[in-house]
Amino acid sequence: MSKIRTRYAPSPTGYFHIGGARTALFNYLFAKHNNGEFIVRIEDTDIERNVEDGAENQLYNLKWLNIFADESIWNPTQSGPYRQSEKLEVYQKYAYQLLEEKKAYRCFCTPEELQKHREDLLKQYKPPIYSRKCFLLSEEQIHKNLADKIPFTIRLLLRDNKEYSWNDLIRGNLIFNTSSMSDPVILKSNQIATYNFAVVIDDHDMKISHILRGEEHISNTPYQLAIKEALGFKDEFVYGHLSIIVDETGKKLSKRNLAVEQFVEGFRKKGYLAEALVNFIALLGWSHPDNIEILDLPTLVKSFTIKNLSAAPSFFDIKKLNWISSEYIKNMDDVMYLAFIKPYVDLNEYDEIKTKVNEICLMFKNQLQYGYQINEIIKESFVPHVGLSNLDQADLDFLKSNPNYRQLLISFKEKINQLDQVNDHNVKEIINWLAHQIKLGDLVLEKPLGGKNLYMPLRIVLSNKKHGPELNKVIALYDKQTILKNLDDAINYLTNAK
């Protein structure tokens, strides 16, 4: 059996979409599982729609995902070129060869004529199949049109009532008859090859064996088989068409839906781990034979088989991505985690705690789903400057609601004052001591005090928040002087409020 060679062939007309990432990943996994080779080539013949850095964006983000091509514009071999724009003469040679062999013909129809013909057929509830008007032109008329420099395309002449079929790796046997197909344009009037024509030549030149691609390419396949046949290529391309990816409403995921992040670049900038994103993408239409869901790239390579691909629509579930991502973050050791998360942290507004970056990052490790989320959580958990002036009337009323709160703050202040250095361990000991003293009755209080009534006054006074991480860890972020000042301010307020 010859070596398995797969390919990912994006058009640089946009940035790296999650659907393209899945196509690339599945081709990569299939090749590597079978000790084969994975090729990336750029289909850049749609000059008007090409994005300036589209090709580089695709390759850069593939590299970020750790999907490395054995051959590409970055590491070419003799199978290249890897940009279609560098093979225009090759495509032209093949197109004119088919013209000479009477397997193709010139079409002088204008876009307006073709559009009208299409509309007329649709009004008659007929399939919009080209009429072959130009195939019926006489040699004299063709020569006259050429002499008059009338623009033309080249169309492949399909065989009448010919069936093209293939055993799709995912969908089984599929059959198309040329009675429902138009003679396809293979060379446009600007002498640039069409997608279907160029892709067959590229797959042949690069010795591609297996082609995994999106469901939308099913209708292209019979045309490509017809082109392959006309060119006399003996390649036995094996096709597999992946499931569509749908959103939460069941509709096909649309790039126009800006409410849903769909581009790899966006996930990278938000701080998703590449390993987590690859893991998530792999589960869009494929499942592990043992239904395992946390799978790193080596495990995916080892486990990936075609039989576990599904033709059913794949649900793009951002909640599942966030869960997978959080699992990867939790499983990082602290050194790796800090190296990952610290570049995202912005504590510029938080002067009192901005030197405690490591402590803050570790505090939220088990809550994070992606890197940039750390700032959202910081904003929810802290205020830029802790002080009595930040408290709203409801907070102040709460502090005044129980006469024991003042004594609690005084006792806590006395213990903090005795410390040489404040850290989360000795703060926790003080909180536990207070709870124990209250339980034993050694702390003189007017009313019973415990649970929420023990922690809430301290949290409000020392963090200005009602909820947040473990109280001892929050308090320990601040220096001793700041803690004592905030306690004094609250005690004085409650003393004067009596």
Curated annotation (Swiss-Prot):
This protein's record includes keyword ATP-binding: yes
GO BP, sorted A to Z: glutamyl-tRNA aminoacylation
Keyword check for Nucleus: no
Pfam families (alphabetical): Anticodon_2, tRNA-synt_1c
Subcellular location: Cytoplasm
Reactions listed under catalytic activity: tRNA(Glu) + L-glutamate + ATP = L-glutamyl-tRNA(Glu) + AMP + diphosphate
Residues spanning the membrane: none
Gene Ontology MF terms: ATP binding; glutamate-tRNA ligase activity; tRNA binding; zinc ion binding
Motif ('HIGH' region): 10-20
InterPro entries: aa-tRNA-synth_I_cd-bd, aa-tRNA-synth_I_codon-bd_sub2, aa-tRNA-synth_I_CS, aa_tRNA-synth_I_cd-bd_sf, Glu-tRNA-ligase_bac/mito, Glu/Gln-tRNA-synth, Glu/Gln-tRNA-synth_Ib_cat-dom, GluQ/Sye
Binding site for ATP: K255
Motif 'KMSKS' region per UniProt: ranges: 252-256
Subunit structure, as described in the record: Monomer.
Function: Catalyzes the attachment of glutamate to tRNA(Glu) in a two-step reaction: glutamate is first activated by ATP to form Glu-AMP and then transferred to the acceptor end of tRNA(Glu).
Listed name of the protein: Glutamate--tRNA ligase
Organism: Mycoplasmoides gallisepticum (strain R(low / passage 15 / clone 2)) (Mycoplasma gallisepticum)
Gene: gltX
